[in-house]
Amino acid sequence: MLSCGVDFDIFEISLKDKPKKMIEISPKGTVPVFVYKNLVLDESIDIMNWATEQKNNNFIKINPHDWALIKSMIKINDGEFKNKLDQYKYTSNKEASLKTKYRKECEIYIKNIDERLEKQEYLLSNKFGYLDMAIFPFIRQFFNVDLKWFEEASYINLKNWVERISGSDLFIK
């Protein structure tokens, strides 16, 4: 929204105690929910697509040649990786061997992202873009499951990428 100059409000939502108004707006009951005039979007990717389509979007420009790769990486991220990430996140720490198994399954994806970042600062180039925006929240969820492990892991490129994005003006705002 910042990239296209749309004013917005962010509300912290407890998923255990969802506000009635949120459910009225989006019966699906998941976050995020974006409301603009008569438009309601309740999928992150739909919100991102809407933002990139705005005339005054001065931030995220997508090279048409990158679309196939973007779609492929997002499909893997939102499918296979997200499923493994949920297993990793929601497995009790008491089940250490199972938690480690799920983390290692996530690492197959994480390693690919880290290797991709050997060549440039961001996923498609040296400039933050659409793909970074789409994938970053999931990578952040992954490392927040066990921050100590992530800090000690050998994914230097990924750690630098996370730090660059986390410290950027866009993220801080």
Locations of the language-model features?
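Secondary-structure junction/capping motif
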Residues: 42-43, 129-130, 173
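GST-like fold's C-terminal all-alpha helical module
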Residues: 73, 77-167
